[in-house]
């Protein structure tokens, strides 16, 4: 105290200011570590953009809408915990899309709710089926071509096969898989009427297994299945019954992989007309004769008999490869998904791309797109998204992942030989179809932030929504051909119809927020 008294006023002020700065720094560190969300609340960058995300006005939907819902749950909580995902709870009817932004965001238009949800009697009239006549009208004109883009790949032109690009011919005793691989083209994995798809599926289901090897790398157990004539498939074994959902306390990056999700994703990709996922089929194996007796030594060491006298194994991997998370037969019969291998010849190598809307894969940190309202403008300026088809392919991928509920899209691959003007492969869907009563709106972030969708994709979604057959029925009919049918739990099928309506409502919101006269490339503050 005596020292303070002898100090000059100026020195006291300097010391006080220094102490205050130290205290503020400590408070900032505590805020970041404890995730209170104060530090970053006003730090959103304001960058240029090419299309307007919009403010709270929603053009007649009461200030709601998908974009507002996404912004409210993400962009205004930039420092929130990663476990607090943007969501819409189930409750939408499978036939009717939401007629307002609030209804779509809540998924509530009179359908089934999730387990434990109480039902109350209402005197309100049921919401009539919204056929999205406005979107159908916009399809007939170019007025909103900045949102609905006519960029469907023309498979009839400039579409060479891998065989033509690599100057390879099928060998004399070529398998169906080898011939399928050589017929892969620049714009799709297989043609709409390609009969080799069913032949490849049939081989994976019927051919005898010769050898089993655990696939190296990855977070969970996968097996490489080898058949005669150098045919290979990637097996994901069954862990849970169809109706078991994602554990509520699991992050997306620690979720279990589901074999049936791989099967369903292939069928959905084909129904959507993308044809960017390799054929996948279900099959039931005898663990003793078709895995244990054919496996290599490293995998054999992990086999054991459970207290229930079921034959089990767990392999070696990053997650869930131990005795408490073993794969078990019943007692030695095991179901799994079998995905056909992509080409492995040298010139057919693939390029790995980091997905621009990749998640942080961290318990607390958020990715840039989760905090920057103008993030799409940055992506649009970076090759290969600044030109060509790639950005539109990512919109398709977002639609596909939103329908399946897959949050685990961190990278994607393309064939090197075709350069940048080719399609991204749809691979690794094991974390889809886990939450039928929850619609993860953040998966749709590319579409919501860019306000962009392919015309051909929108046409498909409208066809599913308006009939004659909804997407759930088309999926059910397609999946019924698989040996392990029923592949999906009924609530997952119903979720497909509900999510179709949510996507359509999102495009409607985008159109209202981006009238033709507003597309001028000017900067707009969308974070307010």
UniProtKB/Swiss-Prot annotation:
Reactions catalysed according to its record: L-seryl-[protein] + ATP = O-phospho-L-seryl-[protein] + ADP + H(+); L-threonyl-[protein] + ATP = O-phospho-L-threonyl-[protein] + ADP + H(+)
GO molecular function terms attached to this record: ATP binding; metal ion binding; protein kinase activity; protein serine kinase activity; protein serine/threonine kinase activity
Pfam families: Fam20C (PF06702)
Tissue: In embryos, prominently expressed in midline glia, salivary gland, intestine and dorsal vessel (heart). Not associated with biomineralization.
InterPro entries: FAM20 (IPR024869), FAM20_C (IPR009581)
Annotated catalytic residues: 408
Keyword entries, A-Z: ATP-binding, Disulfide bond, Glycoprotein, Golgi apparatus, Kinase, Manganese, Membrane, Metal-binding, Nucleotide-binding, Secreted, Serine/threonine-protein kinase, Signal-anchor, Transferase, Transmembrane, Transmembrane helix
Disulphide connectivity of cysteines: 312-328, 317-321, 376-450, 451-510
Site (Cleavage): 76-77
Lumenal side: 34-528
Topology in the lipid bilayer: Single-pass type II membrane protein
Cofactor requirements of the protein: Mn(2+)
UniProt EC number: 2.7.11.1
Cytoplasmic side: 1-12
Compositionally biased residues, Low complexity: 86-107
Region of interest: Disordered: 77-130
Residues that coordinate or bind Mn(2+): 257, 428
Protein family according to the UniProt entry: Belongs to the FAM20 family.
Described function: Golgi serine/threonine protein kinase that phosphorylates secretory pathway proteins within Ser-x-Glu/pSer motifs.
The protein's name: Extracellular serine/threonine protein CG31145
């Amino acid at each position: 105290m005596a020292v303070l008294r002898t100090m000059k006023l100026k020195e006291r002020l300097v010391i006080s200011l220094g102490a205050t700065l130290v205290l503020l720094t400590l408070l900032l560190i505590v805020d970041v570590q404890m995730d209170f969300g104060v530090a970053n609340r006003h730090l959103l960058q304001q960058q240029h953009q090419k299309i307007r995300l919009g403010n709270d006005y929603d053009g007649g939907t009461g200030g709601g809408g998908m974009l507002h819902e996404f912004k409210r749950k993400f962009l205004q909580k930039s420092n929130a915990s990663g476990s607090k995902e943007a969501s819409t709870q189930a409750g939408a009817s499978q036939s009717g899309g939401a007629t307002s932004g609030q209804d779509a965001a809540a998924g509530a238009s009179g359908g089934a709710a999730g387990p434990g949800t109480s039902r109350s009697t209402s005197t309100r009239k049921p919401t009539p089926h919204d056929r999205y006549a406005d979107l159908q009208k916009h399809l007939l004109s170019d007025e909103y071509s900045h949102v609905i883009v006519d960029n469907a790949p023309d498979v009839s032109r400039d579409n060479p096969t891998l065989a033509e690009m690599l100057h390879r011919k099928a060998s004399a005793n070529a398998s169906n898989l080898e011939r399928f691989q050589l017929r892969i083209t620049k714009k799709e994995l297989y043609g709409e009427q390609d009969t080799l798809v069913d032949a490849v599926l049939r081989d994976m289901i019927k051919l005898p297994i010769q050898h089993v090897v655990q696939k190296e790398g990855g977070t969970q157990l996968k097996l490489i299945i080898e058949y005669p004539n150098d045919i290979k498939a990637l097996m994901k074994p069954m862990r849970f019954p169809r109706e078991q959902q994602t554990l509520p306390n699991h992050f997306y990056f620690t979720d279990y992989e589901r074999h049936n999700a791989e099967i369903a994703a292939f069928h959905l990709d084909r129904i959507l007309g993308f044809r960017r996922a390799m054929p996948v089929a279900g099959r039931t194996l005898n663990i003793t004769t078709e895995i244990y007796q054919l496996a290599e030594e490293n995998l054999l060491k992990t086999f054991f008999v459970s207290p229930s006298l079921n034959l089990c194994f767990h392999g070696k991997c990053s997650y869930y490869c131990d005795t408490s998370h073993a794969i078990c037969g019943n007692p030695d019969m095991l179901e799994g998904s079998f995905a056909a291998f992509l080409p492995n010849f040298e010139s057919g190598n693939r390029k790995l791309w980091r997905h621009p809307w990749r998640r942080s894969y961290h318990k607390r940190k958020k990715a840039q797109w989760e905090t920057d309202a103008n993030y799409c403008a940055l992506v649009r300026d970076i090759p290969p998204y600044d030109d060509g088809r790639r950005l539109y392919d990512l919109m398709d991928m977002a639609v596909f992942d939103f329908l399946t509920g897959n949050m685990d899209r961190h990278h994607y691959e393309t064939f090197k030989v075709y350069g940048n003007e080719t399609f991204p492969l749809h691979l690794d869907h094991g974390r889809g179809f886990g939450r039928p009563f929850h619609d993860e709106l953040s998966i749709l972030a590319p579409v919501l932030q860019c306000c962009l969708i392919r015309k051909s994709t929108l046409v498909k979604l409208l066809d599913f929504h308006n009939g004659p057959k909804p997407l759930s029925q088309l999926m059910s009919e397609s999946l019924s051909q698989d040996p392990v049918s029923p592949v999906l739990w009924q609530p997952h099928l119903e979720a497909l119809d509900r999510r179709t309506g949510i996507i359509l409502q999102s495009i409607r919101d985008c159109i209202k927020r981006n009238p033709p006269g507003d597309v001028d490339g000017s900067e707009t503050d969308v974070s307010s």
